[in-house]
Amino acid sequence: MSSYANHQALAGLTLGKSTDYRDTYDASLLQGVPRSLNRDPLGLKADNLPFHGTDIWTLYELSWLNAKGLPQVAVGHVELDYTSANLIESKSFKLYLNSFNQTRFNNWDEVRQTLERDLSTCAQGKVSVALYRLDELEGQPIGHFNGTCIDDQDITIDNYEFTTDYLENATSGEKVVEETLVSHLLKSNCLITHQPDWGSIQIQYRGRQIDREKLLRYLVSFRHHNEFHEQCVERIFNDLLRFCQPEKLSVYARYTRRGGLDINPWRSNSDFVPSTTRLVRQ
């Protein structure tokens, strides 16, 4: 269990509680979670973060009524800046989007502006929103993470409790390498409900070579760990930076969708540009 799982800031969340679904617009449904909850225990300070990045959300179940009452549908792309005070809690995001269902808007841009305004207010930070018509995305190929997959290792694992022990002495030699490693075995659990979160992760770095077996064992140790997606990515970035001390580091995870939403956080201290094409499990 995370050290802050019972923090009072989480007590008012609708997550894990029975809730009514509203289909008329209500911005008050959105709920934020302070990023400081997991950053403080990691020693990460808002004015001196070792990374930049965004939380990329894909909205697959977005619908509203036009001015004449005809339903509209879109796929939304949301980017929430890492400097925001709060992350957006996903169940509240789903409930908020449902409140658009029977609400009339004059045009698509009014919907986009409404989303951008409300999400920025909840997050207390910069948010950008783009809406796509379905025909704009039809035929879009399934993407993949570039890099070397480390999953096919003939190793025995019998411990699934989170630990950084595997990263102790995980680098070797003095030669500096630059490589991208990928795993599809990332699995953590919701901080509140403990429902499983499934993801693929891409780790791009420059520095002393990281032992792939130790890295895989470390990633598998998240299997019983309870944290939100964004928090896991920041924890992984911080742990790799601390124990492996790469010159450059980027960590990008793309999680499977739940409730019509997928969350894809990335953190980097270099000029990393994430691919936004959905992966095969998304």
Curated annotation (Swiss-Prot):
Spans traversing the lipid bilayer: none
Chemical reaction(s) catalysed: 7-aminomethyl-7-carbaguanine + 2 NADP(+) = 7-cyano-7-deazaguanine + 2 NADPH + 3 H(+)
Pfam families (UniProt xref): QueF (PF14489), QueF_N (PF14819)
First-level EC class: oxidoreductase
Residues given in the record as NADPH binding sites: S90, K91, R258, G259
Catalytic residue list: C190 (thioimide intermediate), D197 (proton donor)
Localization (cell): Cytoplasm
Binding positions (substrate): I88, E89, S90, H229, E230
CC terms in the record's Gene Ontology section: cytoplasm
GO biological processes: queuosine biosynthetic process; tRNA modification
Pathway stated in the Swiss-Prot or TrEMBL entry: tRNA modification; tRNA-queuosine biosynthesis
Protein's name in the database: NADPH-dependent 7-cyano-7-deazaguanine reductase
Native source species: Escherichia coli (strain SMS-3-5 / SECEC)
